[in-house]
UniProtKB/Swiss-Prot annotation:
The gene is glk. This is Glucokinase. Coiled coil: none annotated. Its EC number is 2.7.1.2. It is found in: Cytoplasm. Belongs to the bacterial glucokinase family. Keywords: ATP-binding, Cytoplasm, Glycolysis, Kinase, Nucleotide-binding, Transferase.
Length: 343
């Protein structure tokens, strides 16, 4: 299985600027790299406002052209979706396209497509102290793997593994779809309701924006509270942290507890002595609440492996556009070596 796709014509140059696009289930963020890791002209567009990726890219390129900027010939896109061939269909939206056809339609020499959390993993080395908040103490081992997990529209999972001779390889996978194991009574309520309506309950079903709505609906039904229309994720978080609504607070408690448990599972699988990084669009807004929650207790509640996990530092990524440096790295590697460093 391929972990990235690079559609290209015979390149006649590898010059800047280069186009970067981080495509989530809700938003697509475009940027222009004008020199190595010099990234600017960031624009966020709603996925739902454009019929296709090509249309959204044209919208951004038209704005560049109108400003007099030089148009890029090389591009990299991160997708909230597995990338296993030329044809891509987003998991949490209806965009579907051919990478090669999109490259040709836009007149690009190169178009690299990778998973969005793989690009975020590639970008971890470029995060500075101001881009992170440490929520668990620990001592990171520089030569060890780093784990990455993050809830947003879906649940992204990746990691960064040091490679022999220097550098690192980002892992491409779909770890957000692993089985979910509830522990507390409220978690079981949410799990049973989700199982009844959807069948198999993956981690993403509850650890995502849609998961917040699902958890709240399940707790509401259990308590006999009438909810005519399911709350949106934004309504749940506002209810918990601005209005102190009891059901919304219970929803967030379930969410943070499950996240601690799943993050620890990912760390154990990866041997993430280099640390655990929490990304995605939800957590950066609620770092104090996450720190005050059961997350840390659940992270180490793994029986005989408690001592192992207790050594691992955990960080929340708070940078505004943390995946863009990883996309720049993937594109540079492709232009220099034919493919990004992805395993």
């Amino acid at each position: 299985m391929s972990n990235a796709m690079a559609a290209s014509a015979v390149p006649d140059d590898t010059a800047y600027p280069r186009l970067l696009a981080d495509v989530g289930g809700t938003n697509v963020r475009f940027a222009l790299e004008t020199a190595p890791m010099q990234i600017g002209a960031v624009t966020a567009l709603k996925v739902a406002d454009h019929p296709s990726l090509e249309a959204a890219m044209r919208h951004y390129r038209d704005a560049l052209s109108a400003s007099g900027a030089k148009l890029p010939r090389h591009a990299a896109i991160g997708l909230a979706n597995p990338v296993t061939g030329d044809h891509v269909r987003l998991t949490n939206h209806d965009w579907a396209f051919s990478i090669e056809a999109t490259r040709q339609a836009l007149g690009l020499q190169t178009l690299v497509a990778i998973n969005d959390f793989t690009s975020l993993a590639l970008g971890l080395p470029y995060l500075g102290a101001n881009d992170l908040v440490q929520i668990r103490s620990g001592q990171a081992v520089a030569t060890a793997p780093r784990a990455l997990i993050g809830p947003g529209t879906g649940l992204g999972v990746s990691g960064l593994v040091p490679a022999p001779g220097g550098g690192a390889v980002a892992l491409a996978g779909e770890g957000g779809h692993i089985e979910l194991m509830p522990v507390t009574d409220d978690e079981w309520i949410a799990w049973r309701a989700t199982h009844a309506s959807l069948g198999r309950v993956s981690a993403e079903r509850l650890l995502s924006g849609m998961g917040l709505s699902q958890i709240h609906a399940a707790l509401s039904a259990e308590t006999g509270t009438r909810v005519d229309v399911p709350l949106t994720p934004e309504q749940v978080t506002t209810g918990a942290f601005a209005r102190h609504d009891p059901l919304c607070e219970r929803t967030m408690a379930v969410f943070f507890g499950l996240l601690g448990s799943v993050a620890a599972d990912i760390a154990l699988v990866m041997g993430a002595l280099g640390g655990v990084y929490l990304g995605g669009g939800i957590l950066p807004r609620f770092v104090p609440a996450l720190q005050a929650s059961a997350f840390n207790a659940r992270f180490v509640a793994k029986g005989r492996m408690r001592g192992y996990l207790d050594k691992l530092p955990v960080y929340v990524i708070t940078a505004s556009y943390p995946a863009l440096p990883g996309l720049a790295r993937a594109l540079a590697d492709t232009l220099s070596h034919g493919r990004p460093h992805i395993g």
